[in-house]
Amino acid sequence: PYPYGRWWLGEDRGLKANHNYSKQVKELKDFFEISKANMFNENSMNLKSVAMKPVFEGQTTVYLYADDEKEIVDGITFLKGYGIDKIVIVGATESESQLNFIKENNIAVVVKQPYRFPQSTDSDPMETFEIAKKMLDQGILVSIDPTGTASARVSIRNLPFYAGSFSSYGIDKEIALSMITKNPSEILGIDENYGTLEVGKSATLFVSKGDALDIISNNIIHAFI
């Protein structure tokens, strides 16, 4: 649903309350309860419940899409209530007041790419660039979600430049690079084979005459896949 009042219909422009929130939470809770009850039933025809088994057993990560404080706290609390610890937040744009909470629960964050408008009309225009540094300063594992631009091809092309843009707001270049290499590998659980240049790991190497994280000066001259 549209989060703000639809001014073209005469509604107030401010944020709207979700009057279906309690109902939606109950539906989600019912689904989790049914799934947990059926996950050991080998004859169950409820494929959704069967698919939840690795989630409850800690084999699969849950990606929680949440931006504001209440979403984050409610979402994490809900999942923790079912013994689910492998949680990654996607978004967390307005999470500054809950960074300690995120850190205490040992949760990684995939932040939104910075080439976008602020989350809210009254948000700091620089929040999109600064939130990643605030998370890293708290010791939170951070990566970047490249989606949100015109196409998947453009998003992937811009990924190194997103990291470069974050580095312009106080993040060390090496740490910014890790946001698109080492950190996502750890979040995905594939860091034994990918993410860093170490003996025995797989890697794609490239050589750039300019800054590979800078949209203007980068100039890739060699690539080894």
What do these predicted ranges mean?
Residues P1-K86:
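Polyanionic/metal-chelating signatures
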Residues K48, E71, S95, E127-T128, ...:
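Amphipathic coiled-coil/heptad-repeat helices and related helical stalk/stem segments
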Residues Y63-D67, D85-E94, P114-S120:
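Catalytic beta/alpha-barrel core
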